[in-house]
Structures are given as C-alpha cells and as structure tokens.
C-alpha cells in the first residue's frame, strides 16, 4: 500500500472490497485531525492506530473550519489536508474521506460554516442557493483528494463518504435530489473510488446481494454532554467503563458474524474540541471513550480492537465468510449462543460465541469439532476457529481466539489470545508426529491420533512460546500465547523484505531492514526487553538509532540481551507569578462604541422569527458567528421603567449578563441539561431583570448586554436548525417603551493561523490579552487561589518553562479545581490558542489536554485565563496546575505550532 504512481482498481462484491482483485477487510478508525491542532502529532496518532491493527482511517473534513467566508477555502497550517493525506499514505493507512458537506460530528452547526447561518438557501436539500455553496466546497476538497486517490497511485484515499452517515427517507425527494447532486459533483471532479452515503454504497441502496457489508460505526465510545448527565457527572471516565474491552469485543464480533467486511470504529481518536469548534451539546474534551484517548494514550478497550484488527488483516479467510447452519444456535449450555460461519473456498470455520449472562460459563460446543469445553467470561464474546491454515500447517480447533498468522523468514508465526487466567487449548492436524520445544515453562503438549494438543495458562509469565518443527512440514511454526495485557505489546509490521513481529515495547512505530541491520523505532514506558521474529538475514538490531545486542532465542527469535530502562520521572513546574486585570469596559456608559455595527436590520434568513416592530439582533446576521457577543443599547429617559426582559437564544449552557449605566443588573443562564435534553441544540429564555430605582431617570442611558451563545445546532435535511438565532432576540421594558438604538460587536476578523474558531468578542481577545507577546507588566500581581465576587470578565496570565528531553514524549494537561458551588467559567489560552472552556459549577471536565507543538516542551509558554463570573458567588480560579497524563521515551519529531496573530 503506497503512492506508487500506478493505476489500481477498487471495487466490491457481496463479500468484501476488492483491491486489485484481492479481498480486503477494511478495519477503519475514525480520526479527527481538526481536533488535534498540531500537524506533527497527526503522524503519532496514525502510527498508533496502524500499530494497533487498523488498516484505514475515516477522516471528516469540516467545511466550517476551512471556510471563514463564502468562496474562501483555507487548507494551510492546522487545516493542511494535503499534508494529512500524505502522512496517512506514508504510514500505510487507507483513507475513507468524508468532506460532508454536513458532518454532524458534534461540531458547531454540524460542520456547516458560520456564514451559512445568515445566507439564503435551505441546507441539505436541492435548494440552488445551498447547492451552489456546497458544490463549491466539495470542489475545493476534491481538488486535493484527486491527487491522493489510490486508484491513480497518488495516495491511499480508498473510499469517499457523503454527508453525516444518516439515511435519507424515501419520502423526502428534496433530500434525495440533494444527495444525487452531491454524488454527481464528486464524480465530475474525477473521484473514481467507491462512494458511500447514509444508505450504504451509493447506487446500491444499503447492504444487499451485490454489496459488501458496511458498518457505519461499531463501538468506539460516545459523546458526553455538559454536566455529564449520562455519565453521572463522571465524564469520559464513566464512558470508558461502559465501552470497555468486553463491550467493544461483543460489538465487533457481532459485526463479523453478520459478515460485515467494511468496519468503521467511530471513534478511533477524537481529540479536543478547541475554541468554539464543538457543537452546542458537548464540552471541550472529545475523548469520546475512544480506543485512543484525547492525550494520545491507548485505552484499555484497545486490546479487543487490536486483536481483531490484526486477525482480519493477516488471515484472509475472514474476507469471505458464509453463514453455516441455521443462524445463531444455543450451545449445550443454553447460556452460550454460537454463530457458525465458513469460508467456502478454504474450508476454514469460524465460531462467534456470546455469553449473555453475568457469570463466567464453561461448556462444550457440540457440532464445532472443538473437543474440550470453552470458557467465555461474563457478558463477553469470543471468536474461535477450526480448519484454519497457519502457514504450512492446519489448525484443527482452538479455545483461544487467533490474533494473527504470518510467515516470516523460514518460519510461520501464529498468536492466540484470551483473558488472563484462562486456559488456552488448541490442536494441530499432524499426520506425522512433530518435534515440540517449549521456550517457556507454562505450556504443556501431547501428541495422539494425528493431532498435536497444546495447553497454556494465559498471562502467567507474560508471553508463552511453543516451537513446532518437522513432522508434516519442514517449516517450523512458532505458537505464541498471550492474555490481553501481553497482547498489547505484540507488534506485527510489514516491510519490503517481509513481515515481522516485535514483542516488548509500548509501541512499534517503524521497522526497516537495511543490509543485515533491522532498524526499529518506537516507545518505551516501563522497563522492557525486545524480541523479534523477522525476515532472514537479520544480524543486528537498533532501537531508536541505538544498537541493541541480541542473541537467537529458543523460539527462533532475536532476543535483546538485558532490558531497556523505564522512562525517567518527569517533573512539571508549579504555576505561579500570576498577573491579573479586570475587563468588560463595554459595560461602562462612557465606552466608545462608535465603531460598532448598528443593529438596524429588519429581515433575516434565521429560522427564529424577527420580533414585530423590532430590529434583528441575531449575532449571525451581523457576521459574528463564534464566541461572546456584546450589545449596547442607547435610550432616552428611563423614568417609570421597573424592569427589562431580555429574550435570547443560545446553545447548551448559554448565558446572558446585563448592566445599565455600568450597574450590574444580573445574569441569566440556560439550565444544565439532563438526559432528556442533552441532545437539545437550541435553548431560548427570557431574563427578567429589575432596574434599580436610582437609575430610573431622564437623560441618556446605556444598556450593555453580554451573551455567550455556545455555538449552533446541527440540522436534519430541510430543517435549517443551524439558523436558529444566537444572541439577543428582543428587549422589552415594564413601565415604559423607550426607543433603543442597538449596536453590536463580536469577534474580530479571523486571523491566519487559527482560523475562525479561536476567538470571540471579549475585549481582552480583541486587544490580544491572550497572546504570548502581550505586555502585561502593568497588570496587578496576584496569587492563587482567588475569590473575586464580580459580574463580568477578569484575566489571569502567567508564564512557565518546560525542559523535557528531546527523546521524551510527554502528554501534559491543565487541571482546574474549585468548590463546585462557585459560578464561573474559564477560557484557557495557551500561547494564544483557545484550548477549552471550563465551567466550574457544571463540569464534568477538569483536565484539559495541552497538545505538544502548541505546548513548547522545551521552551517558554504563556497561559492566559479569561474568567467570566456572574457575581453571585466568589469566583476563582482556585487550583490551577499542570498534570502529567503519560510519558514515554520515543515519540515523533514535533514542530512548533505558530501562535495566532493579532
């Protein structure tokens, strides 16, 4: 798999994809490069996904991040699609490209650009105005994608997906016409790989007799909303408990038993919804409970995915399976369900066994040929095989799940896995008795009646090795047995000289055989050795450029003499030396707002009705699509006015605060969602605020209002839910009807580095208080914790220096903690990048990942916190500290990411 410049053919039949007429089981992980704003780390994530068994990545490309204005499409810097696709090809991963135009993906407006909220045309239909913009976007993406098509030898783009994966109802002709137009546009742009939409393969609706089975998203976690109602307030830690290895194994084995051969794990790596990128329902972390966590760390549920990924990649029998028998059957013990499949070409048989009870079951499986009872853990599932070729020998049956089978050098290697403490048993068909060497003390074996029987307790002593030689074949077979934890240290890798298998390190990133030296790169966490089964001719081994003395072990491997040391302890600095400055001068009646936009429109494309007789106050209509928005209303004579009712519309956890002549009137915020409202995209409310009697006077008065809109809802075809108003909707007064002249101001024009989602309309953002080069020497020096009781905005800044070694890959987070009764929010800016929003009294997120590249691992860093408090309680920050999430010796070279410009 490479960009070789040659022509290739991609097709499918009812069994699988056909790549150059060879069957392929696609094992794809969804990855969001836009949620990792450090392009160097894209390679790190891709290498980890490939090493853990994935052969493809499913890549959404969000229109909104790339298009700050109509007709403008930016693919530079952290938006460099060409770089990502090139890196994926270099890392030997196929790409399923998903340019939308609508994505969902818990993105602001589902991935539709902010400017589209104020434009004519009904989204996701055949409306000509919408299609004009959508086709222009697809054309911009396709101009890059066409250079990376696998069919043309330019890259590894193997499949192309339209829209968000949802099917189109048959009774919605506008939506169906819209999909057909998008498909025609893609084909006109010379995209000649198979195209999928929400109904399956485009042109062959769904999975039918002529189409390969497609799984749109098997397992991989779930999004968690503000407040964490579904997770009990525990956030993604709880999501991981639900989507554990057992859950992931059951989901994927069910898909395999259903003869699915195009698998999509949604989520492989989620990342961080930095800035104002997230949809209204979700908070900053998009960890998702994915198999690769937000901090780029493999999660415990990775074990199940890795084992099956390597299995479908190295055992071609699984690319063509037919149902054998009459569907699911109960075993002799009715607590087990067995699905029986077979490959009609090779005769290999596969059994998927489910235990639907809450207790371990050990029982025989009549009719499978497996001659001993099989153990399946509580609620778990297991894939067993019989009649499977292991290189030059045949597996009669096994009670352990096969993980891989390769031929390397002058030997075959097969790996079998199971839960810790289980006993793995297998039998090989052997007409003549073979020789057997145990490289470890745990395995036992016996030969009788033409079969070699091997029994191994899994997990005792780590990896167990059995060498089978002579007998029916001159080619030795190395049998390896591992429990889940041990299997996570087994790394197969394809090289031009042939496949190899490495055991020991935390990660294998690359392997290259030059002359007689095998050059390995990867990561080491704990003290470990290195063991290699590889092609012929290996005389020497290096690890990350350093020679590794080896000897030939009893299992025909090269074994490191001694051990590589564990990664050294990492010390992170305390955060002190804080500087402080209050903000929101916009609430002062004397503030100069003459350069602000007059809110004088009377019509809107919003789905929110314009109040009768009132101006349009919706922020989007004035070009302010992301982040905080300020309003200032001038009026004459407030005598008799007892209160003001401010109607506003936001996403989840939006808020409004108001001042009259600089005097705080109060704050209103949307409620914390429960499980029933967690998916609600737009929230509306009216803040009824009393006017102090001393402010009910003649003369000019200024009503200042700050709204935090919290992003736009996604939309179904034809609904235009993303066009619901954000910001103020109307203002009404009790006791009078003053004429109000409104002015509005939000975020400045997007700058080059970060694009449209980094900043909103806070005064400090517009003045560059978040930037590393801002001069804060005149700011007040303070210590944390703080307890300011003030309605409005305050900023805190500090600097810290890291001196991590060049061979160290450390994942670092920022942790904020305080009394949960205190009502305030914090925007976190690192070196100018808006890396998240912390809501102290809502949660559930307290630790925010600081991506290397934006974080200077060997240099000075500037941290700025913009604190928005409602004045009802003391407001922090209280505890702010750096947190080490993980550290290994290895990693990838990391280029510094530019800080945003003014």
Which residues are covered by each model-predicted region?
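N-terminal carbohydrate-binding accessory modules
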Residues: 1-56
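Hydrophobic faces of well-ordered beta-strands that scaffold small-molecule active sites
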Residues: 25-29, 57-59, 95-99, 158-162, ...
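Aromatic-lined substrate-binding rim segments of carbohydrate-active enzymes
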Residues: 41-108, 183, 187
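Aromatic- and acidic-residue-enriched segments that line the glycan-binding/catalytic groove
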Residues: 71-79, 90, 101-125, 132, ...
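Catalytic-core region of carbohydrate-active enzymes that cleave or remodel glycosidic bonds
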Residues: 83-86, 93, 176, 181-194, ...
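Active-site neighborhood of glycoside hydrolase catalytic domains
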Residues: 129-199
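Aromatic-rich peripheral "rim/lid" segments of glycoside hydrolase catalytic domains that contact
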Residues: 274-316, 320
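Non-catalytic C-terminal accessory domains or segments of carbohydrate-active enzymes
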Residues: 302-856, 862, 868-902
């Amino acid at each position: 798999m490479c960009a070789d410049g040659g022509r290739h053919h991609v097709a499918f039949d009812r069994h699988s994809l056909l790549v150059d007429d060879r069957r392929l089981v696609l094992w794809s992980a969804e990855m969001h490069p836009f949620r990792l704003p450090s392009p160097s780390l894209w390679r790190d994530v891709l290498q980890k996904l490939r090493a853990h068994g994935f052969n493809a990545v499913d890549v959404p490309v969000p229109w909104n991040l790339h298009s700050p204005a109509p007709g403008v499409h930016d693919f530079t810097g952290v938006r460099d699609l060409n770089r990502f696709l090139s890196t994926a090809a270099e890392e030997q991963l196929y790409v399923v490209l998903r340019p939308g135009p609508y994505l969902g993906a818990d993105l602001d407006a589902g991935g539709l650009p902010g400017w589209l909220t104020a434009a004519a045309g009904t989204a996701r239909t055949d409306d000509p105005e919408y299609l004009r913009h959508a086709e222009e976007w697809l054309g911009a993406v396709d101009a890059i994608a066409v250079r990376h098509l696998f069919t043309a030898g330019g890259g590894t783009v193997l499949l192309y997906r339209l829209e968000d994966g949802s099917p189109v109802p048959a009774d919605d002709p506008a939506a169906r016409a819209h999909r057909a137009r998008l498909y025609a546009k893609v084909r006109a742009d010379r995209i000649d790989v198979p195209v999928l939409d929400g109904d399956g393969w485009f042109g062959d609706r769904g999975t039918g007799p002529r189409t390969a089975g497609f799984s749109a998203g098997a397992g991989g976690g779930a999004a968690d909303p503000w407040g964490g109602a579904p997770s009990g307030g525990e956030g993604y830690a709880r999501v991981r408990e639900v989507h554990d290895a057992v859950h992931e194994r059951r989901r994927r084995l069910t898909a395999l038993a259903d003869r699915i051969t195009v698998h999509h794990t949604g989520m492989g790596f989620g990342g961080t919804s930095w800035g104002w990128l997230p949809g209204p329902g979700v908070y900053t972390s998009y960890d998702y409970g994915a198999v690769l966590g937000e901090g780029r760390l493999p999660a415990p549920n990775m074990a199940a995915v890795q084992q099956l990924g390597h299995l479908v990649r190295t055992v071609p029998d699984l690319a063509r399976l037919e149902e054998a028998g009459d569907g699911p059957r109960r075993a002799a013990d009715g607590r087990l369900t067995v699905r029986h499949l077979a490959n009609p070409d090779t005769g290999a048989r596969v059994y998927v066994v489910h235990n639907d009870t809450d207790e371990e079951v050990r029982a025989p499986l009549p009719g499978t040929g497996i001659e001993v009872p099989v153990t399946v853990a509580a609620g778990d599932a297991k894939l067993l095989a019989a009649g499977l070729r292991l290189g030059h020998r045949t597996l009669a049956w096994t009670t352990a799940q096969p993980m891989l089978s390769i031929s390397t050098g002058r030997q075959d290697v097969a790996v079998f896995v199971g839960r810790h403490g289980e006993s793995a048993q297998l039998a090989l068909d052997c007409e003549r008795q073979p020789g057997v060497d145990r490289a470890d003390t745990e395995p036992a074996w016996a030969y009788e009646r033409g079969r070699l029987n091997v029994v191994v307790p899994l997990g005792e002593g780590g990896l167990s090795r059995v060498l089978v030689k002579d007998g029916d074949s001159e080619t030795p077979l190395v049998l390896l047995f591992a429990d889940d934890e041990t299997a996570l240290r087994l790394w197969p890798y394809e090289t031009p000289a042939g496949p190899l298998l490495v055991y020991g390190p935390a990660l294998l990133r690359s392997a290259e055989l030059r002359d007689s030296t095998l050059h390995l790169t990867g990561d080491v966490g704990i003290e470990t050795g290195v063991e290699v089964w590889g092609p012929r001719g290996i005389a020497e081994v290096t690890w990350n450029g350093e020679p590794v003395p080896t000897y030939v072990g009893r299992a025909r491997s090269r074994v490191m003499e001694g051990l590589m040391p564990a990664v050294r302890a990492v010390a992170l600095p305390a955060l002190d030396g804080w500087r402080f400055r209050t903000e929101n001068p916009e609430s002062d009646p004397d503030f100069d707002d003459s350069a602000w936009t007059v809110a004088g429109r009377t019509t809107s494309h919003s789905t929110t009705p314009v109040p009768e007789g009132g101006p349009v106050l919706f922020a989007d209509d004035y070009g302010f699509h992301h982040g905080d928005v300020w309003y200032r209303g001038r009026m004459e004579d407030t005598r008799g006015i007892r209160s003001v009712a401010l109607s506003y519309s936001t996403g989840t956890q939006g808020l409004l605060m108001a001042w009259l002549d600089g005097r705080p009137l109060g704050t209103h915020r949307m409620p914390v969602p429960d499980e029933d409202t967690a998916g609600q995209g737009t929230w509306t409310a009216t803040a009824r605020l009393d006017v102090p009697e001393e402010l009910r006077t003649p003369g000019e008065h200024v009503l200042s209002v700050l709204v935090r809109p919290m992003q736009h809802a996604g939309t179904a075809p034809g609904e235009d839910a993303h066009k619901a108003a954000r910001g103020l909707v109307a203002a009404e007064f009790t006791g009078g009807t003053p004429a109000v002249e409104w002015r509005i101001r939000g975020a400045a024009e997007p700058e080059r580095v970060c694009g449209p989602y980094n900043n909103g309309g806070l005064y400090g953002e517009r003045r560059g208080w978040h930037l590393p080069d801002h001069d804060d020497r005149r700011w007040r020096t303070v210590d944390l914790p703080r307890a300011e009781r003030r309605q409005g905005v305050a900023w805190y800044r500090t600097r810290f220096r890291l001196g991590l070694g060049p061979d160290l890959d450390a994942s670092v987070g920022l942790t904020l903690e305080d009394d949960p009764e205190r009502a305030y929010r914090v925007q976190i800016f690192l070196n100018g990048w808006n890396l998240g929003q912390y809501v102290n009294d809502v949660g559930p997120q307290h630790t925010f990942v600081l991506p290397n590249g934006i974080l200077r691992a060997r240099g000075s860093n500037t941290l700025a916190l913009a604190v928005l408090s409602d004045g009802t309680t003391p407001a922090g920050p209280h505890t702010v500290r750096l947190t080490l999430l993980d550290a290994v010796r290895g990693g990838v070279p990391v280029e510094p990411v530019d800080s945003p410009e003014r």
